[in-house]
Amino acid sequence: MNTQSQTIVVKLGTSVLTGGTLKLDRAHMVELVRQCVQLKKAGHQVIVVTSGAIAAGREHLNYPELPKTMANKQLLAAVGQSCLIQAWQSLFGIYGVDVGQMLLTRADLDDRERYLNARDMLQALLKNNIVPIVNENDAVATNEIKVGDNDNLSALVGILAGADKLLLLTDQSGLFTADPRKDPKAELIKEVHTIDETLRKIAGGSGTTLGTGGMATKLQAADVARRAGIEVIIAAGSAENVITDVVNSKPQGTKFLPVECALESRKRWILAGPPSKGSIVIDEGAVNAVQQKGSSLLSKGITEVSGHFVRGGVAKIVNTKGELIARGISRYSSDDLSKILGKHSQDIYAVLGYEYGPVAIHRDDLVLI
C-alpha cells in the first residue's frame, strides 16, 4: 500500500451501484466500501460521490417505469436519497466508520462564500475521520442550478477537497479508441496527457439507463480536474480491487495526468465555480499576450462581446475562430465592455464616465483553458 497520505475522490455511477439492474447491488457496494476502508486504514482520506438516488427510490417504491418528468425524478430522488445514505451508513458501519452526507447544487459552488463554506464543511468531515458521502441535491435542484451529472460534480468536489486523485468508476474499463460495445477492434487508451477534439469525438455522449453520465461527461470531468492538478482515472467499478489498485499505482483503466502547475485556490474556483454567462472575443495580439505572456486582458484587444454578465461575472474568452482560450472574472459588465471594446485603457473613463481600473480581466482572475 502506498504509504504517502493522499485524498481520493471515488465517484460511483448508477450502473456500478446497480450492476446494470434496476436496484442497488448491496453485495457489490460492501466490496467497494471494504476497499475504501482499507485506504483509510492506510492513512488516506476518502470521499465518495454517489449516484443512485433515483434508482434507490424506484426500488423502494416499486415504481413501475423509468421516470420521465422532472417532478417524478425529484420524487424518486427525495425518497431514494434517504435509502441511499442509509445503505452507505449501514455498510460503512460494518467496519466502524462514520459517514456524513453532503447534498450540493450548482448554486453552492457559484457563490464564492458558499463555495468556501462547502469546502470548510468537507474538510471538517475529513479531519474528524468521517467519510463524506456527496450527491447532487436532485430533489430540489432545477435545471438552472443543477451541476447536471455526478461526473462533473465529482471533479468539483475534488477541487473543493484539494484531492490528489479522482477515480471515476463506471461499467466500462476506461476510454477506448472506439465504442467497445460496437467495435471489437477498440483498444483501451491507458494514459492521456492532453484532452483534445479527437478524444472528445471518441468519447461520444451515451449514458446509462438510470444514470445521466456517459463517457463524454467523464472526459469533461477529467479535463476540469486535471487542470486543478488532480490525477484522474476512469476504470470499471466491477474490476477486482480497482480502488486500492489505483492508489497503489497499479494499472487500471485510463489515467489522465494532471497539468504540471496546479491552480491556486481562487483560480480553482473560477474553473469549478460559476458557469459563464457570456463570451468575449479577443484578437490575435490579445491571445498572445494572455497565453504567452500571462498578461491581463485589456479592452483594446476585445473585438466582440456576447451574452449578458454583470461586473464580477464569469465570461468565456475565445479567439476570432471561436476557440476557447480562458475563463475569467470580468471587471466590467457585458454592456460596458460592448462600449469600450477596441478602446485604449486611458479612454475608458471618457466613454463610460467611470472606470473600475485599466484592465477588463486581471490576470489574477483569469484561467487559461
From Swiss-Prot:
Record-linked Pfam families: AA_kinase, PUA
**Lineage top rank: taxon:** Bacteria
Keyword Cell membrane found: no
Looking at the record, the residues that make up the PUA domain are 277-355
Which reaction is this enzyme known to catalyze?
L-glutamate + ATP = L-glutamyl 5-phosphate + ADP
State the NCBIfam families in the record: proB
Q: What is this protein called?
A: Glutamate 5-kinase
